[in-house]
Amino acid sequence: LLEAILHKDNFNRAYKRVKANKGAPGIDGMTIEEALPYLKEHQQEITDRIYRGKYTPSPVRRVEIPKPDGGVRKLGIPTVIDRTLQQAITQKLVPIYEPLFADGSYGYRPNRSAKDAILKVKEYAEQGYTFAVVLDLSKYFDTLNHEILINLLRKNVKDERVVQSVSYTHLRA
């Protein structure tokens, strides 16, 4: 699986996806446009370090985004290089895990939007359902037990190198 993740075509598609998202630079200050020549020059070195288990993501850049209620949402922005690697991993894990998710789940899933979720709620209302629960769990990701997540990942991903890469690139952000 790691070979498929790091394959040039998958990595290039990942970069294009990161570029399309137009995100801000990470802690290194490298923009999306600056990352392309860097990746072209250093992709082999990066992939070699990943294969050897020696790749360490950069620290995330911490920012606070104002919320409508006056509070702030704290975000960690990875570097463009790390986001590209995260996207490359995601592109290969989504086909494995997408079929396992509940049909009524819409958050952070491909080809599902907030509008789709609203249409589903409308459908439930038309079927006679009259109650709904709205939740916004404070600091939810920060409170997840990452060991449980990694063990769930191991059930379907037998390549331990991928499990370790996910642990470093996704769960430390």
What are these regions (language model features)?
Residues 38-39, 77, 81-85, 93, ...:
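Hydrophobic (often cysteine-bearing) scaffold residues that line and stabilize catalytic clefts
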Residues 169-173:
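Conserved small/polar residues in nucleotide/adenosyl-binding loops
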Residues 20-34, 57-84, 100-113, 133:
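Short, conserved non-catalytic motifs in the polymerase core
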Residues 24-27, 31, 76, 115-153:
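Conserved catalytic palm subdomain of right-hand nucleotidyl-transferase polymerases, strongest
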Residues 1-40:
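Non-catalytic, polymerase-adjacent accessory regions of viral genome-replication enzymes
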